[in-house]
Design a protein with these regions (language model features):
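Hydrophobic packing and interface segments
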Residues: 1-612, 617-618, 654
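Long, low-complexity, intrinsically disordered segments
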Residues: 612-654
Length: 654
């Protein structure tokens, strides 16, 4: 079963890599090229039909922010459920203790759902989440002139409330009221952890609360007219350098509370339900993925609507309305990215816990030099991955810029229309002279949009190869490299665990920084384009001012961070954890034969006889549930193997 589940998750992760990384390169190559040549060099409005990169830019919004985000959240969705199902499978055959004592099988064949309640729970929670999302969309409504953000928030909170109610009844029905995990030591069964159904519910509640909390913090650091974004826009008055400095500071500060929320969710979920609780927290956060995806798609839809309004030369007030919608869309997109990063962190931890269970690892000893070395390598990988993604955008954007400049120079109709537009300096086309209008209209359809689309497409396919290989090959190289060099599969499993720990911690922080810094730069630029612009020392700086141009530069710097490298790190974290889970059986078999003489961790003999894992399988791989652990028994029966790793003396667990 585990092999089938991990294979499915690996497939979801692989496609997410292509959609997120490739989509990010596609959209930002077009966006950066269109902005630098169109808005900064030529001085024409965003999404103007004279800009050959306009179509590629609008298509890219859908490729990166809809398809890419959807694949990212789907990967987290699948990964969290599979991590929880694998850990739930370890409960099969364990014993439960009610409040009045008296042991009975909790997950045996005579229990609820033939003992598969813990395995089926993630699937049922996902089903309730789909229903909750459908109902939540009914609460999304805005009165004429109202704030669309309030309607979207109301829908999300409604879905979350429904999810909590449904989740409570599901968890209490599928799981026994209370149970314990045990470990066989010298023929004696030792209780290693105790759990309750209500504890599992609290774990799911913590995951849901963590997702909402990350969204609120992200909105504060990236939303229009919030303190941090206003400060970034005000710093634009003194030039691009101060704008970029302020944005970097904003992005770094924005990592604080999301990490605290994730830490609280991890500690709380582990306290209430052990490693299974961490996986259920990830499922709880992602159960309402349906409505979250709908909210994330709002931004690209509003952005494309503005592009269509500009290309169709609709009245000025139409573009102003779409710009206000787009500003809200930038915030929802930033919140969605924060949510995706938080969910990726919990999903990676769930998969990491499942890897430890399958590989038979009780603890990872960071004083072991192999583990410490791999921790550093893992922490380095997100920076290298981001560098590859950013460099890819830079190269593709350079090709796009050359193509747009070539068309402005070599297509006579475009060149003449651009000169007339610059001569009229922002005046509506209706106020131009008849001669100028004829020149402008002659350029209609002369731009070679297909060339720009082709550049983005080929760049996305070509440039995703290096980041993809880095994510896929590194865990395989580390695991089997250590196995070949040391000849010890147990050391290889520990080293791979260190690699995953390093990449998860570093990757989450870097992803939050890049995503939120880019979002702050984006909306700081938008503030110059709305209403009276940005007021500094009694002077209003509007669209087209030097401060606005500095904001455009900051936004251009932030584009590849928030839409390519930052979100792509989610895929790196989860894909590496999934690959580790896939290859874990190849690491555990030999290691266990060396230490225990068994083919699996602690319970191979029982599994051979009964056809299902023994109680030893469960507790050998999960150290404690909610802190009620008999550590003394573990300490008495562990010895040092000389490498700083504890090994059981008996075959009861490893």
């Amino acid at each position: 079963m585990i092999a089938v589940l991990t294979g499915f998750s690996f497939g979801a992760s692989s496609i997410a890599l292509f959609a997120r990384v490739g989509g990010g390169i596609y959209t930002k190559a077009a966006d950066v090229g269109a902005d630098l040549v169109g808005k900064v060099e030529a001085g024409i409005p965003e999404d103007h039909p004279l800009n050959p990169a306009t179509i590629a830019d609008n298509v890219g919004d859908n490729v990166g922010d809809v398809a890419g985000m959807g694949a990212d959240l789907f990967e987290s969705y699948v990964g969290s459920m599979i991590g929880a199902m694998v850990l739930g499978a370890l409960f099969i055959g364990s014993a439960t203790v009610s409040a009045d004592a008296g042991a009975a099988l909790a997950f045996g064949t005579d229990a609820k759902f033939e003992g598969l309640g813990a395995v089926l729970l993630p699937l049922f929670l996902a089903a309730v989440g789909i229903i909750a999302s459908m109902i939540g969309t009914m609460f999304v409504s805005v009165e004429e002139g109202g704030n669309p953000k309030s309607g979207l928030t109301r829908g999300e909170l409604s879905a979350a409330f429904i999810m909590l109610i449904g989740g409570f009844f599901l968890i209490t029905h599928l799981l026994p009221e209370a149970w314990v995990t045990t470990k066989l030591v010298d023929g004696e069964t030792i209780i290693t952890g105790s759990y309750t159904a209500i504890g599992v519910f609290y774990a799911s509640l913590l995951g849901l609360a963590c997702g909402i909390g990350i969204g609120l913090v992200t909105e504060n650091y990236t939303g229009i007219n919030t303190g941090p974004v206003t400060e970034v826009s005000r710093q634009s008055v003194t030039g691009s350098a101060t704008n970029i400095i302020a944005g970097i500071g904003c992005g770094m500060r924005s990592t604080t509370w999301p990490i605290i929320f994730i830490a609280i969710a991890i500690l709380g979920a582990y306290h209430f339900a052990g490693l299974y609780g961490i996986a259920i927290a990830a499922v709880g956060m992602l159960a309402n993925t349906g409505i979250q995806l709908a909210v994330d798609a709002y931004g690209p839809i509003a952005d494309n609507a503005g592009g269509i309004a500009e290309m169709s030369e609709l009245p000025k007030e139409v573009r102003e309305r779409t710009d206000s919608l787009d500003a809200v869309g930038n915030s929802t997109a930033a919140i969605g990215k924060g949510f995706a990063i938080g969910s990726a962190a919990l999903t990676a931890l769930a998969l990491f816990a499942a890897y430890m269970g399958v590989a038979g690892i009780n603890t990872i000893n960071i004083s072991n030099p192999s583990v410490m070395a791999c921790l550093f390598v893992g922490a380095m990988l997100p920076f290298l991955f981001s560098a590859l993604a950013i460099d890819a955008v830079g190269r593709a954007a350079g090709d796009m810029i050359k193509e747009v400049q070539r068309q402005f120079k070599n297509i006579p109709e475009l060149k003449a229309a651009l000169e007339k537009m610059q001569a009229n300096d922002g005046k509506p086309v209706e106020e131009w002279s008849e001669e100028d209008r004829k020149v402008y209209e002659a350029a209609d359809g002369k731009a070679e949009y297909a060339n720009c689309v082709s550049i983005s497409t080929s760049a996305a396919i070509r440039e995703m190869i290096k980041p993809g290989l880095l994510a896929v090959l590194t865990p395989v190289a580390v695991a089997f490299g250590f196995k070949i060099v040391t000849g010890d599969a147990a050391i290889a499993a520990q080293a791979l665990g260190g690699l995953l720990a390093g990449v998860t911690v570093s990757g989450v922080l870097l992803a939050l920084f890049q995503s939120n810094a880019g979002g702050a730069w984006d909306n700081a630029k938008k503030m110059f384009e709305m209403g009276d612009g940005v007021e500094v020392d009694g002077v209003y700086h509007k669209k087209g001012s030097e401060a606005h141009k500095a904001g455009v530069v900051g936004d251009t710097v932030g584009d590849p961070l928030k839409d390519t490298s930052g979100p792509s790190l989610n895929i790196l974290l989860k894909l590496m954890s999934v690959i580790a889970l896939v290859i874990a059986p190849l690491l555990v078999a030999e290691g266990d034969q060396k230490t225990n003489g068994n083919a699996t961790a602690g319970g191979a003999n029982t599994e051979e006889a009964t056809g299902k894992p023994s109680a030893n399988d469960i507790t050998a791989n999960e150290d404690s549930g909610d802190g009620n652990t008999t550590d003394e028994a573990n300490d008495e029966n562990n010895t040092d193997d000389g490498n700083g790793e504890s090994q059981p003396e008996s075959g009861g667990g490893s």
